[in-house]
């Protein structure tokens, strides 16, 4: 048997169900966390809001932020016995832009 936890954003599955995931993995069940909104942003110029967050978090760029957050998520999943799977299709909300090219979260 295999359990898959769908996580909209990095760390959501572990924060929401980490104890259950741990118990399942410890019982020998294969457990995966699938994070959907963790793709690398296509823009080299993130919104002012994203830039403020990068500064607060101590990261130099959007790419570094996503790379390090993915690594953190994978370590957290590993700690509870799960395997982290990251999808590249959609970036997190702070990197998304509307049809007009403007940031959704300026």
What is the predicted role of each segment?
Residues 1-106:
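Active-site beta-strand->loop->alpha-helix modules in alpha/beta enzyme cores, enriched
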């Amino acid at each position: 048997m295999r359990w898959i936890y769908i996580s909209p954003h990095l760390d959501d599955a572990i924060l929401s169900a980490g104890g259950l995931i741990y118990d399942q993995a410890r019982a020998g069940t294969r457990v995966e966390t699938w994070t959907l909104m963790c793709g690398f942003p296509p823009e080299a110029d993130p919104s002012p809001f994203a830039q403020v967050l990068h500064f607060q978090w101590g990261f130099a760029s959007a790419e570094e932020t996503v790379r390090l957050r993915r690594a953190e998520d994978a370590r957290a999943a590993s700690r509870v016995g799960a395997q982290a799977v990251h999808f590249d299709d959609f970036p997190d909300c702070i990197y998304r832009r509307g049809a007009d090219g403007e940031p959704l979260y300026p």
